[in-house]
UniProtKB/Swiss-Prot annotation:
Role summary: Essential subunit of the Sec protein translocation channel SecYEG. Clamps together the 2 halves of SecY. May contact the channel plug during translocation.
Lineage per the UniProt record: Archaea, Thermoproteota, Thermoprotei, Sulfolobales, Sulfolobaceae
Protein name stated in the entry: Protein translocase subunit SecE
Regions annotated as coiled coil: none
Domain of life where this protein originates: Archaea
Compartment(s): Cell membrane
GO biological process: intracellular protein transmembrane transport; protein secretion; protein targeting
Alphabetical keyword list: Cell membrane, Membrane, Protein transport, Translocation, Transmembrane, Transmembrane helix, Transport
Amino acid sequence: MKVFSIMKISDIIKRLREDWKRIISVAKKPDKDSFNYSIRLTLLVMAVVGLIAYIVQLTTSLIIR
């Protein structure tokens, strides 16, 4: 098993900070329409996944009886 030393962990954290800074400097704020579209799509997908989970749970509970 490979054990990380304190030096390696600090290097990893520094590299992560640099990567995050680079990502934030390139990222841009979405406009209102794009943001609303993303919110609606996310909520729709969550509802579909929840509905599928409910149907699976209902089906398995009916089969087990």
